[in-house]
Amino acid sequence: MTQQVDRVSTSKPLWARYSWIGWVIVVGIAVAFPFVVDRPRFWLPNIGVRSLWLGIIAMSLVFLNRYVGLLSLAQATIAGISAYGVGYAMVTMGLGFFVAVATGIVAGTVAGFLVALIAARTKAIYFLMITLALGQVFYSYASQAIEVTNARRGLAPIKKPDLGFVNLNDITTFYFFVLALAVLCYLLCRYVAATSFGLALQGIRDSPERMAALGYRVNRYRIGAITFAAFIASIGGVVLVLDRAQVDPDVVSLGSTLDILVVAVIGGIGSLGGVFLGALVLTFLDNFAQDFTDRYQSLTGVVFIIVLLFAPAGIAGIGKQVKRVIDRRRKELSFFSVGDPQQEPPAAQSAEEAITKGKQQ
């Protein structure tokens, strides 16, 4: 007697194997964006560039949440510290562009390291509240420190340079410069997540006690992850200050912190690439909702609630959510198409017949 064995494929499902095609299309649209809009001087700075630096900063938040299990509300503050570093170096000290950029990135990364030293031993709501409190402490400092931040007036003007081989004052060139940075930040996050360091972070996220028992120093890994996320946020802060041409306490305010959180949730709190979709939604609402209502911030809140209710995984997770629904329906249909569940299988019937015959003998 031969038995037919069904082979179960252990490979990734079709949608997962070809999901990269969707992101290639998104990047293609981003590249074509400056050439298809009718008013580039409006669309590129207000929608394109702003969406990109918002996405870069939000990506640092998503990295911590996805691979470490920590939700940080200090990422906007870290980006703001980086922006202040660039502004202070260029406006107050009169340093060159590259030195100022390096100063900003170092300042933001060091700030993230200090946040990590304070908050790495906590988790969940305690980590969130500590990072929020630290952000508000710096906001108060930036609003009052006239010698360093120029208080409410901020630091200005911060001019984009003409580097010879690339002129960042040209809006199209600056857009492609920021787009390249966004792609590099995304690839860097994916690379770090795939290294032994990233795999250890995921193990710490799932079971810190077990990883500690295996000899991993959990706090050190968390400090490293928070510092790396601060480095990514600092790059976003550099782009922010070059785009705005000034830096003031508004960039580290509670409103800016909530903007980054909204971008991450709408795009997908577990998707590194989805943050750019969330940033696009937020910038569209900021620029166009004001034409229809004077309560455009309320409209942003409504969109935020709708996403939480109907797409908890964000815009980037809608495809997976639809796939799960389809798979569940297929299983339900296959269950009802098997046959009469009350009918006993032949193997069971033959076993009962054998027992009956044995008793008769």
Which ranges hold each PLM region?
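Transmembrane alpha-helices and adjacent helix-loop boundaries
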Residues: T2-Q361
